[in-house]
Amino acid sequence: MNKLNFDISSFDAFFKSVNFYLIKCGYKISFLDNKRPWGGFFAIDESQSQKFSNQFFDGKKIDNFRIAGKLSPKILLIKPKTRLSWQYHLRREEIWRVFFGKVGVIKNNSNNQQKILFLKEGDQEKIKTEERHRLIGIDNFAIVSEIWQHTDNENPSNEEDIVRVEDDFGREI
């Protein structure tokens, strides 16, 4: 166990301990997925966006995050030594903040992946619409808090709003 009492003995144990932590903090989990090849995620009820920001983004007012409508808070769990797709989105921007552990990030406006930026707990990164990006698990499990900033009020982003440029797991590009 560690200072936040997350069990890092296996991914299943880690996922369960984060689930318990989120419920203990009073979050309503609208959807969860522990079957992603890189880890998994918890989608938090959008009505709790300010509560989420208070805890995971230093209490910033959610109105300062809004672009064109709703916000969607999520918790990403990243397995060690895995890479999410090199990808971009057409209908959202994202704000990431490392809550637990360390991750790598690659981002730029072209399809060329460049150097890795290493982020530690408390570090934050902004992803613009159509900006290529990838999260990378380093040596241990990590938690990244994320807020989707929807850019199209009439057609909010969803899990299908992913344009994959490269994928380590053979998913469709």
What spans do the regions from the language model cover?
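Glycine- and acidic-residue-biased ligand/ion/polar-headgroup-sensing regions
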Residues: 80, 90-110
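Conserved hydrophobic/aromatic beta-strand scaffold that supports enzyme active sites
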Residues: 73-77, 95, 116, 124-126
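Double-stranded beta-helix
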Residues: 2, 136-173
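A short, N-terminal "cap"/entry segment at the start of jelly-roll beta-barrel domains
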Residues: 1-71, 117, 162-164, 169-173
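Structural motif
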Residues: 102, 132, 141-143
